[in-house]
From Swiss-Prot:
It is found in: Cytoplasm. It catalyses: beta-D-fructose 1,6-bisphosphate + H2O = beta-D-fructose 6-phosphate + phosphate. Homotetramer. It comes from the Bacteria. The gene is fbp. GO terms for biological process: fructose 1,6-bisphosphate metabolic process; fructose 6-phosphate metabolic process; fructose metabolic process; gluconeogenesis; sucrose biosynthetic process. Its cofactor is Mg(2+). Pfam families: FBPase (PF00316), FBPase_C (PF18913). Keywords: Carbohydrate metabolism, Cytoplasm, Hydrolase, Magnesium, Metal-binding. Its EC number is 3.1.3.11. Belongs to the FBPase class 1 family. This is Fructose-1,6-bisphosphatase class 1.
């Protein structure tokens, strides 16, 4: 696992350089979900592919930007599912973006995820990484190396931040009431449109909730299970929080039928998730 994390660190520096120096415009292609690809999406995907080609532990790569599985090493142990540049459309307005990695031992599904990591490309490059049985660890880049900032990232029982995703006019009434009730309690809005920076802020500021519900236009949610939802669910649970879907099911129990399946998702401290379950009428 050390080799995989080390590879993520090395490729993160290359992606950060690309963000700072290369064309931020659109390419002439679409990803597997039919979304227009930015040139940075394509470049970041290429950099990650190239980086893992030499890592014999990795059996397959599955990218959010591609439809199929990329076989690497037939004797490898792990499948890595990744979003090469989450929130890439924010780069041209100079907001933080990120990369997400889920490391699966066996079939890619929640129960087989053994480690995950994400990178934040902002004023500084930071990485949060987690393995089973340990609190997530926080690293920050300096002079080309990643130094440990905190060996235990822990969510408080109750937070102060509220990051509600999805177009509000497409929310159901009980989700809107839930969000409004949090603001009535004094919660602060923190939503950039980037999953990585928003969840990173909640994690490092001690707690709160990030929600991306099913909506009238996207009833199955927008965020992809293998690349985004399950890796972050793992990190939030390891930090002492919870991550569930709209029925109260742990996101770590998801079994995607297709690599690009999506799910409504909610990540937060225990207090906020309990309040969400009450609002959604599911058993705590």
């Amino acid at each position: 696992m050390h080799t995989i994390f080390e590879t993520i660190e090395k490729v993160a520096l290359k992606i950060d350089h690309a963000i700072k120096t290369e064309d931020l415009g659109y390419s002439e292609s679409e990803n597997s979900s039919g979304e227009d690809q930015l040139k940075l999406d394509v470049k970041s995907d290429y950099l990650i592919e190239e980086a893992f080609k030499s890592v014999s532990l990795v059996k397959d790569l599955i990218s959010e930007e591609k439809e199929g599985v990329m076989p690497l090493h037939s004797n490898g142990k792990y499948t890595i599912c990744y979003d090469p540049l989450d929130g890439s459309s924010l780069a041209d307005v100079n907001l933080s973006v990120g990369s997400i990695f889920g490391i699966y031992d066996g079939e890619p599904k929640g129960e087989n995820l053994v480690a995950s990591a994400y990178v934040v490309y902002g004023p500084r490059i930071e990485i949060i990484r987690a393995v089973k049985g340990e609190r997530p660890k926080h690293y920050r880049a300096q002079d080309g190396f990643f130094n440990l900032v905190s060996k235990e990232v822990i969510l408080k029982e109750k937070g102060k931040l509220n990051a509600p995703g999805g177009t509000q006019q497409n929310w159901c009434d009980y989700h809107k009431s839930f969000v409004d009730d949090l603001f009535a309690e004094g919660y602060r809005l923190r939503y950039s449109g980037g999953m990585v920076p928003d969840l990173h802020q909640i994690l490092l500021k001690g707690g709160g909730i990030f929600s991306y519900p099913g909506t009238s236009d996207k009833p199955h949610g927008k965020l992809r299970q293998l690349f985004e939802v399950i890796p972050f669910a793992f990190i939030y649970e390891q930090a002492g929080g919870q991550a569930i879907d709209a029925k109260g099911k742990r996101l770590m129990e998801l079994v995607p039928a297709h690599p690009h399946d999506t799910s409504p998702c909610f990540f937060g401290s225990n207090y906020e998730i309990k309040a969400l379950k009450k609002a959604y009428g599911v058993n705590a």
